[in-house]
Amino acid sequence: MKSGQAEIMETSKGIQKSGLMSRRIAILEFILRIVAFFNTIGSAILMGTTHETLPFFTQFIRFQAEYNDLPALTFFVVANAVVSGYLILSLTLAFVHIVKRKTQNTRILLIILDVAMLGLLTSGASSAAAIVYLAHNGNNKTNWFAICQQFNSFCERISGSLIGSFIAIVLLILLILLSAIALSRRH
């Protein structure tokens, strides 16, 4: 009789330990979603408010550089805004994962949506990175000149917004891995 009770006690301790680990993973997932949200919304705002005007010879002729002059940078802003909106909405499901234990269906849904948002964010950041590279280095074969010697503030801001977006990409990858780990621990 005592050995049966001992087995039950060990099993219940294992379940409690597994439940505690799942809760920790859910809390970490919640925190990573918040941090990723601030990175994506910060990148969208930083890029969306980027504007610099340079006088040329006289006060009447000016050159301007804005993010919406280039479609790739506009796509970057939209992609970051969409992903930040998704991350805010996904916080509700992440909170449910902290409170409840049986959340396999919502975890699968979050993995699918996280992968879709990762693809969107990666494509937006990659297209913007190509434009930022051209802004810094130019392309001699096509006679595209580097503009960052003239538009210092513009180039610093678009480069900074890329950093935030790439950090969010890494965080989304971690979120996908955490959700997969949490799912695998349940089976």
Curated annotation (Swiss-Prot):
Localization terms from the record: Cell membrane
A cellular component term, taken from the record's GO annotations: Casparian strip
Membrane topology value: Multi-pass membrane protein
Keyword check for Cell membrane: yes
Keywords for the protein's UniProt record, in alphabetical order: Cell membrane, Cell wall biogenesis/degradation, Glycoprotein, Membrane, Transmembrane, Transmembrane helix
Keyword Nucleotidyltransferase: no
Membrane-traversing stretches: 25-45, 75-95, 108-128, 162-182
Segments on the Cytoplasmic face: 1-24, 96-107, 183-187
Glycan-linked positions: N140
Highest rank taxon of the organism: Eukaryota
GO MF assignments: protein homodimerization activity
Pfam families on file: CASP_dom
Extracellular topological domain: 46-74, 129-161
Record-level GO BP terms: cell wall modification; cell-cell junction assembly
Entry similarity comment: Belongs to the Casparian strip membrane proteins (CASP) family.
Complex and partners: Homodimer and heterodimers with other CASP proteins. Interacts with CASP1, CASP3 and CASP4.
Chain's role: Regulates membrane-cell wall junctions and localized cell wall deposition. Required for establishment of the Casparian strip membrane domain (CSD) and the subsequent formation of Casparian strips, a cell wall modification of the root endodermis that determines an apoplastic barrier between the intraorganismal apoplasm and the extraorganismal apoplasm and prevents lateral diffusion.
The protein, known as: Casparian strip membrane protein 5
Organism annotation: Arabidopsis thaliana
Lineage, highest ranks first: Eukaryota, Viridiplantae, Streptophyta, Embryophyta, Tracheophyta
